[in-house]
From Swiss-Prot:
Name of the coding gene: mtm-6
Binding positions for a 1,2-diacyl-sn-glycero-3-phospho-(1D-myo-inositol-3,5-bisphosphate) per the UniProt entry: 249, 274-275, 336-341, 377, 381
Tissues where the protein occurs: Expressed in intestinal cells. Expressed in head neurons, pre-anal ganglion, hypodermal cells, anal depressor muscle and non-neuronal cells in the tail.
Active-site residues, record numbering mapped to chain: 335
EC number: 3.1.3.95
Topology in the lipid bilayer: Peripheral membrane protein
The reaction(s) this protein catalyses: a 1,2-diacyl-sn-glycero-3-phospho-(1D-myo-inositol-3,5-bisphosphate) + H2O = a 1,2-diacyl-sn-glycero-3-phospho-(1D-myo-inositol-5-phosphate) + phosphate; a 1,2-diacyl-sn-glycero-3-phospho-(1D-myo-inositol-3-phosphate) + H2O = a 1,2-diacyl-sn-glycero-3-phospho-(1D-myo-inositol) + phosphate; 1,2-dioctanoyl-sn-glycero-3-phospho-(1D-myo-inositol-3,5-bisphosphate) + H2O = 1,2-dioctanoyl-sn-glycero-3-phospho-(1D-myo-inositol-5-phosphate) + phosphate; 1,2-dioctanoyl-sn-glycero-3-phospho-(1-D-myo-inositol-3-phosphate) + H2O = 1,2-dioctanoyl-sn-glycero-3-phospho-(1D-myo-inositol) + phosphate
Function: In association with mtm-9, plays a role in endosome trafficking probably by regulating phosphatidylinositol-3-phosphate levels. Regulates fluid phase endocytosis in coelomocytes. Controls the endosomal localization of sorting nexin snx-3 and the levels of sorting receptor mig-14.
Domain of life: Eukaryota
Residues involved in substrate binding: 249-252, 274-275, 335-341, 381
FYVE-type zinc finger segments: 618-675
Protein name: Phosphatidylinositol-3,5-bisphosphate 3-phosphatase MTMR6
Gene inactivation effect: RNAi-mediated knockdown causes an increase in phosphatidylinositol-3-phosphate at the apical plasma membrane of intestinal cells.
PANTHER family: MYOTUBULARIN-RELATED (PTHR10807), PHOSPHATIDYLINOSITOL-3-PHOSPHATE PHOSPHATASE (PTHR10807:SF8)
Amino acid sequence: MRFEDIGISKVDKVCLVDRLGCQENLVGTVHVTTTHIIFRAENGSKELWLATGLISSVEKGTLTAAGCMLVIRCKHFQVITLLISRDKSCQDLYETLQRAAKPVSVNVTELLAFENREPVEDVRGWRRLDWNSEMTRQGITKSQWTESNINEGYTICDTYPNKLWFPTAASTSVLLGSCKFRSRGRLPVLTYFHQQTEAALCRCAQPLTGFSARCVEDEKLMELVGKANTNSDNLFLVDTRPRVNAMVNKVQGKGFEDERNYSNMRFHFFDIENIHVMRASQARLLDAVTKCRDVTEYWKTLEASGWLKHVRSVVECSLFLAESISRGTSCVVHCSDGWDRTSQVVALCQLLLDPYYRTIHGFQVLIEKDWLGFGHKFDDRCGHVGALNDEAGKEVSPIFTQWLDCIWQIMQQKPRAFQFNERYLIEMHEHVYSCQFGTFIGNCDKDRRDLNLSKRTKSLWTWMDARHDDYMNPFYSPTAHVALLDLDTRAARFTVWTAMYNRFDNGLQPRERLEDLTMAAMEHVGVLESHVAQLRTRLAELKTQQNQQITSTNTPTNMVDSGMSSATDDLKNLSLSHPLDPLSSTLPILERATSQESGVMDSSLYYPDEALTKYSLKWQPLRGADRCSNPACRGEFSSTIERRIHCHLCGMIFCRRCLKVSADERERVCDKCKTD
């Protein structure tokens, strides 16, 4: 948001209303900057920051005796309700927030990501995908598929990457002819090669057939795609649109392929609706999860939204593709322009087939390849910049959100197949819209290069790499699943993703997340086991020193044995005990034992109590931990998705800002423990 768009920069005596009535309302001040909306409570108990790019809509209520209500709905599904006593202040703030939600400027360089004042040296983040390395990893047979420089400099298709792979037998004239016959020049190209069956997954846009047009070069290219598979030359062409929609496009000179003109090809339609239907569907879904007050109304609104039906359609189409490729049949997929529904099903199909894409790093590579590389229009679909007219505003649609929802549905059935957890998906979704990073800015790869984003903005991947442990799934087993082809696609298996759509609705008794409880327990056990290992090491040192003293001083054996037996036996008992057993009863024994001896013990063998009591046996529970334990911070955890992190020494919960990682990256300690 530009400085001149700020009509009012500060509003006092604003009441932050808890719409669920679970917490007390807070009086404070609202500050408006070019990048954030900030609410700070007068008593200092709460400070809420909201990036202006996350504002979706603003609603102003009627003036009452108490004041005027202002409801801010966000793209990451937070709902903020403000009660402002003065109507003039409310109107000024409303108009300011409206300009943030619907920016007048169409200049993408005014986004938050470009406000970065630090020098950008983010090579790893901006080079997450290396096309040649990825195709080599897939095991492409160069005798059948080859890299082409036909789109070098984005000359034939500006929404495709400049590196493309085609059947080796395809000539340049065939490629150019097919390019002219496909919408937006998006001809069939390889995106995934299944090494076990040599089946290929290709993507493209709809053909410009109209009612009778055909293209010999396009037909030849499709034939070569089928023949590139030495195990089967059959080819499935999957149109993700409803058949009636494809028929309507014929009137516009577009449409779908005539099966009679393509040899060895079978046609399949899948009824995945367009961006306008999905936008309306999500709006009804949000009405159900945020506005409905009784169960009957909730279920009626949810059913009317059709959201779960649409999610199911995407999963079913992706599963069909995965099953076909695993059986050895190559597939070509398109929708209208090949950057919305095609990106959804092609990427989800690869996720089902290849366990690499179900890792944290591999998932980022998949997004870079099939969403960013092949031109999903993130600027338009996410509404990053203002629209020149109302028609351009209708380009906004939750296509990427829906794809993440599909992945979450699969995670519920296969919880051990994914290295990452749902926090990974939710935080990624937030930053797709926040525009804090440059990764998801631009409509295609060419846009991002023209904007020089790698030099001017930071990569989301680097930011997430620094929080890698936040996204680990404690139940992940790399060998548990290879291909996920046994999904249950019955309607009852698809449910509302409440952690996403009700992320900020904590309620009276917010539940701890099972993943977080498990991770905290595993981390605690790991810390204690590490401490036990240190004690065992110290025990070995004591034994070594004992033997050295025997040799050097020629002390009678019975005196040494009597002097050391008490200490070493206690350490043995301690090292063999369970890491979670209380150690308080055994901790003082070493000091007592050594102090009672008659001068035989060397001072270097003394092992003080503070070394044994370094780690807390009892950690602060996650339940009720809604604030950082640092008295100077007391930062609030606004939702259960925000990770509560334990100090390895005192066991208290802190926010990430108040914890420091040791030099060897083995310990995480708070400022107080670090000082002590």
